[in-house]
Amino acid sequence: EEVEMKEKKQQKSKKKKGWDPLSLTVLLIALCVFVFSAYQLAMMMVPYYTGGEEYDEIKNLAIVSDKIGEGVEEAPKFQVDFDKLMQENPDTVAWLRFDQPSIISYPVVKSADNNEYLTKTFSANDNKLGAIFMDMRNQNDFSDRNTFIYGHNMKVGGEMFSQLNEYASEDFYKAHPYFYIYTPDGKTRTYEVFSARVVKDSAEV
């Protein structure tokens, strides 16, 4: 009898160790959800990576000198090869650069349609990063009283105009109040940030 009891206990323990159909189904569903979520995340990150790589290549192509000037109000002494930029994209009108956040250093384009560069990079590739572009109503030579330049506030990666959020800090503003516009005619325009605020994309400008 003792032997029979031991055999029954062993059989029960073996049954407990196995996967029942319900548990196996739940596990497979969870695994599928995980794989799908990982795939979606990877697909979401690809544009940030490819777009970032593209703009790094453009910087390597176009910036021929990158020395910082002396004095707070002196523009960085670096030169942009606008001939190469024009060959890559004839819509080029300028180069925009901040000392800090230093990541904001991009070519500026202009199109007859403000929607064109919302999802198209400087090199005309479809990408959610888009490009930094001037309002179609402005003059290319920045002779207007107000010139509007647009760029995306990317939630991941910090590309394009995302880092402008740093100006929410008064200390950051005081430390880095200037930015610079370089144009194909060889001029460098120095601007001082006097106001920064967050508005909806539907706000009138």
Question: What is each model feature region?
Answer:
Residues 1-19:
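N-terminal Lys/Arg-rich, disordered targeting/topogenic segments
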Residues 13-31:
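N-terminal Sec-pathway targeting helices
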Residues 31-205:
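Solvent-exposed, non-transmembrane regions of membrane-associated and secreted proteins
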